[in-house]
Amino acid sequence: MKLSAVLLAIALLALSLVQCLGLPDPSTKCVMECDTQEYRSICAADDKGSTKTYRNLCVMKTENCLQNANFQKISDKECP
């Protein structure tokens, strides 16, 4: 009985330390708070030469993270 209480206390302490230290939750790695109302279109290209228009830079960065892509801004206007 005492052993299970001690193990429970250790588990709770470990959990609270993780929360207090602010260790990142891997499931929220790509969550970025983009202003979806902000329309500052950009043209971006990836390593393969593909181009894509994004609503704004934040949206591009978020999609890069979610899709494991590598688009980089090449201009401050829509792609041709």
From Swiss-Prot:
Subcellular location: Secreted
Tissue: Strongly expressed in the developing fly wing but is excluded from the presumptive wing margin.
Top-level taxon: Eukaryota
GO molecular function, one term: serine-type endopeptidase inhibitor activity
Deletion phenotype: High pupal lethality, a significant reduction in the number of chemosensory bristles at the wing margin and narrower distribution of wg.
Domain Kazal-like stretches: 24-80
Keyword Disulfide bond: yes
Disulfide partners: C30-C65, C34-C58, C43-C79
GO annotation (BP), single: imaginal disc-derived wing margin morphogenesis
Signal peptide: 1-22
Site positions (Reactive bond): T36, Q37
SUPFAM superfamilies: Kazal-type serine protease inhibitors
InterPro entries: Kazal_dom, Kazal_dom_sf
Keywords: Disulfide bond, Protease inhibitor, Secreted, Serine protease inhibitor, Signal
More about this protein: The name 'pegasus' comes from the mythical winged horse able to carry Greek heroes over long distances.
Biological role: Increases short-range diffusion of the wingless/wg protein, enhancing its signaling and expression of target genes required for wing margin morphogenesis. May act as a serine protease inhibitor since it possess the Kazal serine protease inhibitor signature.
Protein name: Protein pegasus
Organism: Drosophila melanogaster (Fruit fly)
Gene: peg
